[in-house]
Each structure stands twice: as C-alpha cells, then as structure tokens.
C-alpha cells in the first residue's frame, strides 16, 4: 500500500490544534478532508506530534497510506488547491511502508517569539507574546541555559498518562534583535506545554516575579510551573528525520 510523507506549514490562530476533535476545526481534519476528496476514499493522516490551539508550525511532518498510487507532484498541486489559506503543503514524497510520522522522527526544534515592547507590532502580534516590561536578556539567557541537559521535566508538563518525563534538552539558545526576542529549543521529543512553561518560567524569573529557587525545584521534578507562556508565540520550526 503506497505510503506518502507530507511536509507542511500552518498558521495555528484559527485551529484547535493538530489532532481531530469533534465539531472543531483542526489541521489534521482539514488535511484528511482534502485527501479524501482527492483520492475518493477515507484517509487517516498520522502527524509527528500534537500541537495546542493557537500554536503554529513552519515545518510539520505527516504521513498517510492510500489504495491509490498517485503522482507526487500531482498530489502536491491538488492538495494546495483545496486546502484553506492557513495551511500549505510544500513537499509530498513516497516513503517506505514502515515510515510513521510519529515514530520515525529523530528530533524537533521549537521557536518561541517574544515582542518586548509597550507598543504592539500588528504584523507580529498573531505570532508572538507581547511582554511590555523590559526583559533583561542577559539574565534571561543565563536562566534558559540552566534548562539545557538532562532533567526531569515532570513539573513543566501536563501529565495525562504515565510516561517518561526525563528528557535531554540538547540546546536552548537566545537570539535578540530588540525588541524581538527569539528562543530556540532542540530535543528528541517534548512533553505537552513543556516549551511554553520553560519560556514562561524563564521570563517571569528574569522580570523578578519569581526567585531562581523556583527553577531549581522545577528541574528536580518538584512543584508546578508558575506560568505557561501563551500559544501564539510558539512555532514548530523544524522536524528532524
């Protein structure tokens, strides 16, 4: 049975995340609807991860199997002709039958954008967290570096099921082109809300609203994250295969 990989991007503003939910607009739902229309059969799409409502993706991996052997370029053109304007597929590739978007991924890179100004930027507002108080970026950089390495991130996620919460956060970097602040995080996988809670906690500590003792407890898997950064600043930037 032919197995196809999709690479796509989407603006998450008007979506209730990736995963299909009854009576709600989701990215998975839109893609399955488009593929079913093109292929004239029910299609189930597997995504590389969940995304929360309002979160964006610059690079998202999905796959699906079909009864039909469809030319890649023809399928790419057909998909982009049907999908809504806030979703774009930029690559379609036939892969081995064993490929699974959820389990074949080797890592992910997330980007979080902060607009650090009292004046709203209307072009970045849907894609960033506006923080009006001035952030000391050197303090923020030092705090973020403490998240690097292997830690128990239990206190920085929402535990919906029993799973391993010890993760090696390979890289956390900060890029400042003031007032735009960009935070990148790389790991083999992430827990739900993990990136948003790392960013939210680091920003609140750098603003002096929480002590660094809170951070030490969180990195030992104790307590609960004091703040979750809003979803619109979060972008899945790269999926590593």
From Swiss-Prot:
- Is tRNA processing there in the keyword field? yes
What positions constitute the catalytic site? 52
Q: Name one GO molecular function term.
A: pseudouridine synthase activity
Tell me which EC number(s) this protein carries: 5.4.99.12
Residues annotated as binding substrate are 110
User: Whom does it interact with, and what assembly results?
Assistant: Homodimer.
Top-level taxon of the source organism: Bacteria
Q: What does this protein do?
A: Formation of pseudouridine at positions 38, 39 and 40 in the anticodon stem and loop of transfer RNAs.
Give an example GO biological process.
tRNA pseudouridine synthesis
- Return any one Pfam family short name: PseudoU_synth_1
What does the sequence similarity comment in the record state about its family? Belongs to the tRNA pseudouridine synthase TruA family.
Protein name, entry field = tRNA pseudouridine synthase A
User: Which residue ranges run through the membrane?
Assistant: none
Question: Which reaction is recorded as catalysed by this protein?
Answer: uridine(38/39/40) in tRNA = pseudouridine(38/39/40) in tRNA
| Source lineage | Bacteria, Pseudomonadati, Aquificota, Aquificia, Aquificales
NCBIfam families given in the database record: hisT_truA (TIGR00071)
Tell me the keywords, alphabetical order: Isomerase, tRNA processing
Class of the enzyme per the UniProt entry, highest EC level = isomerase
């Amino acid at each position: 049975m032919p197995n196809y990989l999709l690479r796509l991007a989407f603006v998450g503003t008007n979506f209730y995340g990736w995963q299909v939910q009854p009576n709600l607009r989701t990215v998975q739902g839109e893609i399955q609807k488009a593929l079913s229309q093109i292929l004239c059969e029910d299609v189930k799409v597997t995504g590389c991860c969940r995304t929360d409502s309002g979160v964006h993706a610059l690079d998202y991996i999905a796959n699906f199997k079909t009864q039909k052997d469809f030319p890649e370029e023809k399928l790419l053109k057909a998909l982009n002709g049907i999908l809504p304007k806030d979703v774009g597929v930029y690559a379609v590739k036939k892969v081995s039958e064993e490929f699974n978007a959820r389990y074949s991924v080797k890592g992910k890179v997330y980007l979080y954008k902060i607009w650090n100004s009292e004046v709203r930027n209307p072009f970045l507002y849907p894609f960033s967290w506006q923080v009006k108080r001035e952030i000391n970026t050197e303090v923020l950089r030092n705090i973020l570096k403490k998240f690097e390495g292997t830690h128990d991130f239990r206190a920085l996620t929402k535990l919906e099921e029993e799973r391993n919460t010890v993760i090696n956060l390979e890289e956390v970097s900060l890029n400042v082109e003031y007032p735009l602040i960009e935070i990148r995080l790389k790991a083999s996988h992430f827990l739900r809300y993990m990136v948003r809670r790392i960013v939210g906690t680091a920003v609140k500590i750098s603003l002096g609203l929480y002590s660094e003792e809170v951070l030490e407890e969180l990195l030992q898997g104790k307590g609960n994250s004091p703040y979750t950064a809003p979803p619109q600043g979060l972008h899945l930037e790269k999926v590593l295969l």
